[in-house]
């Protein structure tokens, strides 16, 4: 997975550590980890394999936030569902007592809250970051790239595509009304943008 997806390193807490240290912090300084869902390409940095070969939390002093339903869902389902979940990404967090489960919309800390955005998985959530009267929405896989802004454009990976459609419809209505900055996790070219308030359909204005 390290070679294919860049989400795991052996013997270090993942490549996230490099970026954290470059910003002047260490993994021990991290106190909150937000998981939009628990697919391996999103939760792969939650744990790491230490020098003794043990899987341990990457951020031992943090509380890890996810929807309770997502954690339960990750432990069941058919082969299609299970293919995207790796227990080593989340079970060691439970063993360490670090999970902070939420159910539905939740205020995580001042200026940061999560809202359900199901479809990709039944308990997927997106993150709202609020500061100085403005809002940014970290969409994650409800809309992974700018190309997925139009309502009909939905990933083939989504377990419940028609639910994704309704999640996007609701998010876009609020995003247009409140002029949200939309953040795309999987887009290699477009990091963020806003919806054109003058368009009769969801149209992105790239910033």
Show the residue positions of the predicted features:
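Short acidic/His/Gly/Ser-rich catalytic and metal-binding motifs that mark active-site loops
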Residues: 1, 73-75, 146-150
